[in-house]
């Protein structure tokens, strides 16, 4: 149906969802490497954050933890470099041609990783590599649609048991 309505449209992945997928797989590997540390919610919060968003005392705490787990330190650094690459925006076509081999190298490293979660992530990114690479050129996303959907879900939870669809529809129109 989409191809009929917009035959020349290019699919672009949503940056938020790509970064979230990377973080989820990274945390899954972390749980495998350090099952005890992964239950520490403070460490979980530190490992999920981008390095640029850490306060100095948090950076010290994370550095101490990663120093005691060298394998995690390598994975964390890899994830940070991949995230930095994916967070680039509004690049020229020339810059995108320069960035594409770097992305492909990251994908190859993931696919040849010794961890099943990272291999799966590598295969996923490989199958979506064109759509992921388009994130650098095109900044439009579906954030507004997701926001409306969230508001409608909240409204639906609040109106549980109501049977009048007209009232529900009116509430959606007013909220969104």
Provide a role label for each language-model segment.
Residues 1-6, 10, 16-20, 38-176:
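Acidic/histidine-rich catalytic cores and adjacent linkers
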Residues 18-37:
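Short alpha-helix plus adjacent loop in nuclease-associated cores
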